[in-house]
Amino acid sequence: MRLIARPLTAEAFAHFGEVLEAPGTPGRAYFDRALANRHPAASPSLSIVAKEPLPALPLRSAVMERHPFSSQSFVPLDAGRWLAVVAPRAADGGPDMARARAFLARGDQGVTYGVCVWHHPFTVLDRLARFAVVMWRDGTAADDEFVEVPAFEVHLPD
């Protein structure tokens, strides 16, 4: 399967979560969906991740993940462009890869994946990137679910 990454916009991403962007003028933006938690035993978790860029396009993968009890937010601290790949839930509960979408984010855009939203592990382009990652965790295997999916590729538009 071949996906073409489209520019990340709040409208296009709304079904999967929330786009995190600073306001264009002085002020504050609130992102209340960034802290969703459905597990009373979980605690908030903040991690800082440094990630090497993808060596070459296209992105080729056969894995998706979700967090059954927590949203997960990626906030760029020092980043170039990066990819957010998402899929709605299929009737069997797994990712519906036939309806998967790929988004090309700018280095000043973050996302919150909603609770239980299938997504690909985040992939950075251009250069080493640093992100803050916020989610809820209880330290068990239930925090993360990874599944194999049919192979797919993500390309940038021509």
Where in the sequence are the language-model features?
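Short hydrophobic/aromatic-rich beta-strand segments that constitute the beta-sheet cores
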Residues: 83-84, 112, 120, 133
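Residue-level detector of short, conserved catalytic/binding motifs and their immediate flanks
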Residues: 72, 111, 129
